Amino acid sequence: MSRIIHSEDDDDDDVGSQSSSSLSSPSKSLQQDPIPTKIPLSTSIILEKKLPLEQHQKLSNLTEGSTAGGHVSNNSLDNKIMIRFVPIGSTPSIQPRVFKISATQTVSTLNRFLCKKLKFKGVLNLYIQNSFMPLPDEQIGSLYGLFKTNNELIISYCNTIAFG
């Protein structure tokens, strides 16, 4: 049996009684607060997101077109984007400079394509708008969506590191 004894000030009895009651109330509130239980992620529920009406209609049209006609239009699945290749420094240029390529291709595919066109043994350094080197596994479509200029993706290439 433990007891806590609080001393009160001699000057003002009301202030002392308030302080002693305020000191004892936090301990009561700590005892009354329940301890949160941890719930593992395996018990969580995954809610399905409903598609907006416009996207739902496009999806249903796409599935109907593939079952009825046997194929889907090239415009919906095989999105081609324009890429302009610009040489940096003494790297030889290719003709023509503008090519169409599928949006699902990766940067490493572009690198192999340029090496084949230039008959270059090794790896070229590719830059998006002369500012940064994209990752080799990055898709061209995502880069095009972020960095297109006049409906073209400008990719500069060099056989040495051009920008530190």
Swiss-Prot record:
Its membrane topology: Peripheral membrane protein
Keyword Membrane listed: yes
Record's keyword terms, sorted: Autophagy, Isopeptide bond, Membrane, Protein transport, Transport, Ubl conjugation pathway
SUPFAM superfamilies documented for this protein: Ubiquitin-like
Gene Ontology cellular-component terms listed: Atg12-Atg5-Atg16 complex; autophagosome membrane; cytosol; phagophore assembly site membrane
Gene Ontology biological process: autophagosome assembly; autophagosome maturation; autophagy of mitochondrion; cytoplasm to vacuole targeting by the Cvt pathway; glycophagy; piecemeal microautophagy of the nucleus
Region (Disordered): 1-36
Covalent cross-link (Glycyl lysine isopeptide (Gly-Lys) (interchain with K-148 in ATG5)), residues: 164
Major localisation: membrane
Leader peptide range in chain numbering: none
Molecular function in Gene Ontology: Atg8-family ligase activity; enzyme activator activity; protein tag activity
Segments of skewed composition (Low complexity): 16-29
Pfam families, A to Z: APG12
Location of the protein in the cell: Preautophagosomal structure membrane
Job description of the protein: Ubiquitin-like protein involved in cytoplasm to vacuole transport (Cvt), autophagy vesicles formation, mitophagy, and nucleophagy. Conjugation with ATG5 through a ubiquitin-like conjugating system involving also ATG7 as an E1-like activating enzyme and ATG10 as an E2-like conjugating enzyme, is essential for its function. The ATG12-ATG5 conjugate functions as an E3-like enzyme which is required for lipidation of ATG8 and ATG8 association to the vesicle membranes.
Family affiliation: Belongs to the ATG12 family.
Quaternary structure, from the entry: Forms a conjugate with ATG5.
Protein name: Ubiquitin-like protein ATG12
Organism: Candida albicans (strain SC5314 / ATCC MYA-2876)
